[in-house]
Each structure stands twice: as C-alpha cells, then as structure tokens.
Swiss-Prot record:
It catalyses: Catalyzes the rearrangement of -S-S- bonds in proteins. Residues 28-143, 147-262 form the Thioredoxin domain. Gene3D superfamilies: Endoplasmic reticulum resident protein 29, C-terminal domain, Glutaredoxin. The gene is PDIL2-2. One of its GO terms (molecular function) is protein disulfide isomerase activity. NCBIfam families: pdi_dom. Its main location: secreted. This is Protein disulfide isomerase-like 2-2.
C-alpha cells in the first residue's frame, strides 16, 4: 500500500508553531506557587534580569518578619504588573540563593532593587513598603502606567444583620476578629488575616470573619470584647465562643485552624499529604492491600459499612476509598500506580484550585493502597 506524502507546505507551519510554543515555554518566567511574583534562582537571575524588561527584585529571607509583613503588598504588586510587557516583579530567597544576594550587595532583608532594561546595575528602593508606593516607583522607573489590581477579599464582613446567621451556624467553624479601624495592631494583623481567609476559601465548613467593633459596640460588649484586636473562635460545638490566645503569624493561625477544624492546608492554601485521609479507612486499606481477591471483597464491604458512619467532608472522602478499592478489584493493583501518575501530570497543568483539591485528595488516598 502506498504511503501518503505530506506536503512540505503543510508541515512548515506546524514546525513553526511548535518552535514558537517551545520558545515561549522556555522563555516564560517561573512564577512562585500561589502568587504572581517571578521566583528567581542562581541559574535564572541573569537570564531574566537585565534583559529586555525592567525588573523590581525583592531579596528576602523566609524567616524575616519584615519580609512576611511585606509579602501581601508585594504579591498585590505582582498581580497588578503580571501582564505588563516592559517590566516584571520578582523575588529571590537569599537563604536558598546566597551567591546572588551577595553579588548584589544584599546585607539586610528585605532589600528591594530596581534593575533597568538591559542593565545589571541596580538602584536601591528606599520608599515605603506599600503596594501603592512600590507601584508608583515601578511606573516611574519603567515608564509604565499600571493601576493596582483590586483583589477581592475572602474575609466575611460581619454586622448586626448577619452576625447570628453566620457565627451561630452549627455546621460551620468560625474565627472572628473584633477590630477597630484606628487600631495599629489591627492594621498590622489585616494582611495576615486576609491571607488566612484566602487559605481556607475553598473549605465550606470554615469561615474567617471580622467585625468593626468600634462601629458595632453592642455586639462587641455582648462577647466581652474590651481591647483590639480580639479574636474569638466559634466552633460547631461551642457557639458561646472561646478566646484565641495563640500567635498572630500566618503559621500560627493555620496550625490552629487545622487542629480545631480537621482541615489540612499549608500557608499557601494547598492541601497537605494528610488531606482526605481517614485513620479507620487507612487501616482497612492496608488490610485490603495484603489480602487475596476473595478476602478483598469482604474488606470492601467493611469499608462501605465504615463510610456509612461518616458525615460531612469525611463521608465524601470515604467514598474515594470505596471507588479506589473497586477499581483495584476490577483492574488489578497496577491501577494505583497508573492513576497516581495521571493525577501528578494533571496537577502540573493549569487547573482550578477546587479541581487541584480533588486530585490531591485522591492521590493521598491512593498512597494508602500502594505502600
């Protein structure tokens, strides 16, 4: 049978398109997980900076308190300039990439420097560490006219009309900040609290809320608020509320919420390796793994009985165990390896946060059937 010939005229555009796609893939800056700021390394710094765009670079350390305070402002800046063609917003972790920071004279954190287009000679930024001031600086130095992006808040705003319906909901765990607009400590907490709300925005059973206690004094007095900010936790089983006396860094809040609400998030809002796991079903999965096929059917039946006892998100996650066990019975144990690899490929793609949650939970449960 004759093999059909492909015209060079048809293949050339295909090769050109492929080459363009590859060039874009290799040229595209590496954005840090969970934000809109380009994460630079020792190997990528001079490939990105000093080229055909101006760059604002923050040199930071993960443990630095001033860097943590700057983070939400800098991320807001990054989101605003993400689509700008002539400038970009970047950062370097100086704990991980010491040689870069040393080369550019960084001796304290955070250090913010402007690198003009085509130059590796920086200009140190000495202004205020707010998104507004930084944007004005970048627009002046880079010749741009970018407006700051409006980032929708994930904090639920409470008042007399909705306080009881939200806070006293027996199906939800609520953290409430009672604040005053003029309070300095409240202003310091605000970006951290906003970040916390963003971390749990996909968890229906968790609500991060605040109340202007200066404006709504009756509600503040009802719950014994005498100073600002006061944080109170209203869990499903205690709608009288309990004082939150922990630390006020994002790590502290995330640890508290995970422990109290049974969630499994990190500070970037991503699910951890424990998300979706249920101890009683993990034990049955291990038993299932080591059993012969006939015995596996009996264990599957035990799993189904266990899942019936669960409620809320645990019941939903329990169904994942059942589905995986049935797939293994139908397709053999290779299913776990192939499905895990498929999920890992999907997680590398651009997918919605809710879909990423779904895939991570399934991947976590699969791990109990494969170890």
């Amino acid at each position: 049978m004759a093999i059909p010939r492909i015209s060079p005229r048809k293949t050339l555009p295909l090769f050109a398109a492929l080459a363009l796609a590859l060039a874009w893939a290799f040229a595209a800056p590496a954005f840090a997980d969970g934000d809109d700021v380009v994460a630079l390394t020792e190997s990528t710094f001079e490939k990105e900076v000093g080229q055909d765009r101006g760059a604002l670079v923050e040199f930071y350390a993960p443990w630095c308190g001033h860097c943590k305070k700057l983070a939400p402002e800098y991320e807001k800046l990054g989101a605003s300039f993400k689509k700008a063609k002539s400038v970009f917003i970047a950062k370097v972790d100086c704990d991980e990439h010491k040689s870069v920071c040393s080369k550019y004279g960084v001796s304290g954190y955070p250090t913010i420097q402007w690198f003009p287009k085509g130059s590796l000679e920086p200009k140190k930024y000495e202004g205020q560490r707010s998104a507004e001031a930084l944007a004005e600086f970048v627009n002046t130095e880079g010749g741009t006219n970018v407006k700051l992006a409006t980032i929708p808040s994930s904090v639920v705003v409470l008042g007399p009309d909705n306080f009881d319906s939200i806070v006293l909901d027996e199906n939800k765990d609520i953290l409430v900040e009672f604040y005053a607009p003029w309070c300095g400590h409240c202003k310091h907490l605000a970006p951290i609290y906003e970040k916390l709300a963003s971390v749990y925005k996909l968890d229906d059973g968790v609500v991060i809320a605040n109340l202007d206690a200066d404006k709504h004094k009756d509600l503040a007095e009802k719950y014994g608020v005498s100073g600002y900010p006061t944080l109170k936790f209203f869990p499903k089983g205690n709608k009288a509320g309990e004082d939150y006396d922990g630390g006020r860094e994002l790590d502290d809040f995330v640890k508290f919420i995970n422990e109290k609400c049974g969630t499994s998030r990190d500070t970037k809002g991503q699910l951890t390796s424990e998300a979706g796991r249920i101890a009683s079903l993990d034990a049955l999965a291990k038993e299932f793994l080591g059993a012969a096929n006939d015995k596996r059917k009996e264990i599957l039946s035990n799993m189904e009985e266990e899942v019936v006892k669960l409620s809320g998100s645990a019941a939903k996650h329990g169904k994942v165990y059942i589905a995986i066990a049935k797939k293994i019975l139908d397709k053999g144990h290779d299913y776990t390896k192939k499905e895990t690899e498929r999920l890992e490929r999907m997680l590398e793609k651009s997918i919605s946060p809710s879909k990423a949650d779904e895939f991570i939970i399934k991947k976590n449960v699969l791990s109990t059937f494969s170890s």
